[in-house]
Amino acid sequence: MSPRRLLPLLSTPHKGGRSAMTCQFRCGNQCAHDVANTSGNPYFGEVAEQALSRRGVLRAGALGALVAGAGVTMGAAPAMADPGRSGPPRGKGGLGFEPVAPNKADALTVPKGYRSSAVVRWGDPVLPGAPAFDFDNQTAEAQAMQFGYNCDYVTLFEMNRNRGLLWVNHEYTDENLMFRGYTDGTAATEEQIKIAMAAHGGSVVEVERVRNTGEWKLVTNGRRRYNRRITVSTPMRFSGPAAGSDLLKTAADPKGVKPVGMLNNCAGGTTPWGTVLTAEENFNQYFVNGDKVPEAQKPYITRYSIPSGTAGRRFDRIEERFDLEKHPNEVNRFGWIVEIDPFDPDSTPIKRTALGRFAHEAATTTISRDGRLVAYMGDDSRFEYVYKFVSKGRYIKGHDRHNRTLLDEGTLYVARFTGDSPKEELDGSGRLPSDGAFDGSGEWIPLVSGDRSFVEGMTAAEVLVYTRAAADKVSATKMDRPEDMERNPVTGGVYIALTNNSNRTPAQVDEANPRAANKHGHVVELIEQRDDAAAKKFSWSVPLVCGDPNDPSTYFAGFDKTKVSPISCPDNLAFDPDGNLWISTDGNALGTNDGLFVMPVKGKERGYVRQFLTVPVAAETCGPLISDDQLSVWVAVQHPGEADGATPDRPASRWPDGEGSQPRPSVAVVWHERGKKIGA
């Protein structure tokens, strides 16, 4: 049999568009290491390939025949949405802006008629009394009172129409851009390491609207009594079934209930009672001597990609708890969903163990038909899984004391995806199967509920602390870096951003496992049975297969590809009140800047992807938030100027402050210059 043509994004091994510097500081070069998931569980590529093969040539020839020799145009510039075409007529919830063209500008580029500004930047004072930022005279004491480094998840709690509290994650630090002459953690000064530790975590800052428009600015005077910094050194507590487990006990915390700090917080979510859920992601890279833990722990150290030896930022030089030879359980105290009350600056952040431990990307909540709280979560690593938590108790509006117990008791599930086409119809000819469908089904497999484990050979505490290993045992489906998961407020569908997976090589391709080097990523649409978030079964489809629209194998839900924008590496997701899907990208493998895109998911414009903005050189677009009044679009501009070879003496970006300045990760807001709603 001749080899089958690979799906979109998938032709050659590639690490995407990230710089080597980003890979080093953000995730500890995960792509350079062995894949942590060596289980024999099914890979979503196999499942999706079956569904795609069933369709063969999708609507308007979107994917093309899956046969050898159907080459992809690589030399041509990526296609872009044609601003000269009107596209489909606007309906309710339609969007009418002129798409931003792909570019490499050192600027936040927005559509004609829109404006943007940086609301809060790395080093801006957060706490009253904090000094003004001085790049060449940084101190750890000052940084602990200032806005942290690489901002990610953003959410706004409105106090009234014109004032609000902005929560922002600070995912990681890039010391090469923060300090002149930096080489590595071993040679760094202790003060530099302390500054980096203080630059992690999160911030609560008060913001105010400007002149009744969609523009917002940082409040810089007055009490600002809610402003707060959370860092690696902030006291926290565990709650839920694993709290107090032997797996969480250390010399400094013999009861296993008082963790300290949070690390590598990526995306997140909010609760109906007004708190933040922030997700600890690539926590593994902060520890040393992973090879020197007790033998019984080593399989789990490997499963979570904890490094051996001493390298990286060397937090262990300041606090020895990061040395696993001395404190082997300390690593188990990271990788959780952390709940924080932005309206109580004296409250203790809570690590919710019932939601499991892995490289959490997000925690999107909703209420099921019978009133239970549901949280959707992705594990952002190659070949990892997607999860759902369903509370035992029911949400009662206005009863916050009761509601704050919901995340402590419930059932944690992992997803298994299945294709539904008979094998005899999968001949690779491009002929439609008898059902003519491009979809599949799936189920949520229970892992643990309270103190009851559903995984053979593992206690409830082990399932929660070593969740990846538990999911391996129940044949969960391996995914291509499952990142954000968001539920559509209009349709109820759940959307999963699968960023990419460079590690499926051509040597691994066969008839049952035919996809390699997922270079540009895709988006999965999941519909819960009976539209009930607590359901145990679902259907799924792939409405967006990312890449250059000139590539005949990309797919935009059947929409005319001459009108769409190229998109690569979907990361964070958001919805506007009309139910349009907003997609931010990370590591654009098409050679241009990352951006924010919007795609209707229903009606005639389903699949009509348009680029709304691009971020500056070498930056990532994070934390998109579309305000309820649709007057503002918020984005976190992470790691501007994080290009290979860049240093403070040779910066690759000057954003946001311009000539003569250093690049500063910042949260920006975009609004229509005439006060219209976004997309008007």
Protein language model features and the residues they cover:
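N-terminal secretory signal peptides
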Residues: 1-52
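Long, well-ordered hydrophobic secondary-structure segments characteristic of membrane-embedded
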Residues: 91-272, 278-284, 294-296, 300-341, ...
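Signature of short aromatic-glycine-proline-rich micro-motifs recurring in repeat-based ectodomains
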Residues: 142-156, 254-267, 473-484, 559-574, ...
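Residue-level detector of Asp-centered blade-edge/turn motifs that repeat once per structural unit
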Residues: 158-161, 271-272, 367-370, 489-490, ...
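Loop/turn-rich, solvent-exposed surfaces of beta-rich toroidal or solenoidal domains
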Residues: 562-602
